[in-house]
């Protein structure tokens, strides 16, 4: 594994699988996982998500989980509603605990 660790300001490329606690996949950046979960969409471009850490481009728990990760590192995290879409609100995932499997594929320093 690379010794470079993700920090604020870095652009991190990350593959992910998002699941509910029961194991049902709700989103993924990986084509094979989408096919397996019955979520495959021909119009979607399955590739790593690019996130600039510290810019709040993704839910807070997702961003926090990426901090300190290395290239080719995999991590599984459980995000309570407070670290995802909040306890309540209009978002369909508000109030839900979410699980993510993350795989960092690249880290680019500014």
Task: List the predicted regions and their residue ranges.
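FKBP-type peptidyl-prolyl cis-trans isomerases
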Residues: 1-110
């Amino acid at each position: 594994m690379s010794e470079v660790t993700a920090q604020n300001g870095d652009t991190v490329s990350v593959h992910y699988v998002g699941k509910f606690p029961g194991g049902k996949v709700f989103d993924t950046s990986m084509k094979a996982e989408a096919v397996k979960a019955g979520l495959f969409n021909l119009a979607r471009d399955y590739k790593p998500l690019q996130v600039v850490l510290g810019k709040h481009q993704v839910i807070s728990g997702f961003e926090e989980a990426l901090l300190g990760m290395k290239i080719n590192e995999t991590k599984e995290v459980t995000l309570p509603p407070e670290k995802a879409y909040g306890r309540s609100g209009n978002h369909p995932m508000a109030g839900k605990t979410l699980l993510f499997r993350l795989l960092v594929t690249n880290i680019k320093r500014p």
